Amino acid sequence: MGILIPLVSVSAFWAIIGFGGPWIVPKGPNRGIIQLMIIMTAVCCWMFWIMVFLHQLNPLIGPQINVKTIRWISEKWGDAPNVINN
């Protein structure tokens, strides 16, 4: 359920821009180009957002910290006996 609200709301926003944006372009010699630019902008922005959003849901590689670094951090933060002995 937590993924559904941002997915639908952001997708709806870019769909409104992509479908509604070309209708507000005034008539002129470059109307077709401007309409295409609006549609392509909406598609590219949505694709960039959806790729970043979906890749954050299930990352392939998690953060990796050296054991030496973990011990140094635990010593500096004052939790050394609990972390090092486990």
Swiss-Prot record:
It is found in: Apical cell membrane. The chain crosses the membrane at residues 1-21, 33-53. One of its GO terms (molecular function) is proton-transporting ATPase activity, rotational mechanism. It is a multi-pass membrane protein. One of its GO terms (biological process) is embryonic body morphogenesis. Residues 54-86 are lumenal. Keywords: Cell membrane, Hydrogen ion transport, Ion transport, Membrane, Transmembrane, Transmembrane helix, Transport. Disruption phenotype: RNAi-mediated knockdown causes hyperfusion of epidermal cells in embryos. Residues 22-32 are cytoplasmic. GO terms for cellular component: apical junction complex; apical plasma membrane; plasma membrane proton-transporting V-type ATPase complex; proton-transporting V-type ATPase, V0 domain. InterPro entries: ATPase_V0-cplx_e1/e2_su, ATPase_V0-cplx_e1/e2_su_met. Subunit of the V0 complex of vacuolar(H+)-ATPase (V-ATPase), a multisubunit enzyme composed of a peripheral complex (V1) that hydrolyzes ATP and a membrane integral complex (V0) that translocates protons. V-ATPase is responsible for acidifying and maintaining the pH of intracellular compartments and in some cell types, is targeted to the plasma membrane, where it is responsible for acidifying the extracellular environment. During embryonic development, the V-ATPase is required to repress fusion of epidermal cells probably by negatively regulating eff-1-mediated cell fusion. Belongs to the V-ATPase e1/e2 subunit family. V-ATPase is a heteromultimeric enzyme made up of two complexes: the ATP-hydrolytic V1 complex and the proton translocation V0 complex. The V1 complex consists of three catalytic AB heterodimers that form a heterohexamer, three peripheral stalks each consisting of EG heterodimers, one central rotor including subunits D and F, and the regulatory subunits C and H. The proton translocation complex V0 consists of the proton transport subunit a, a ring of proteolipid subunits c9c'', rotary subunit d, subunits e and f, and the accessory subunits vah-19/Ac45 and vah-20/PRR. This is V-type proton ATPase subunit e. It comes from Caenorhabditis elegans. The gene is vha-17.
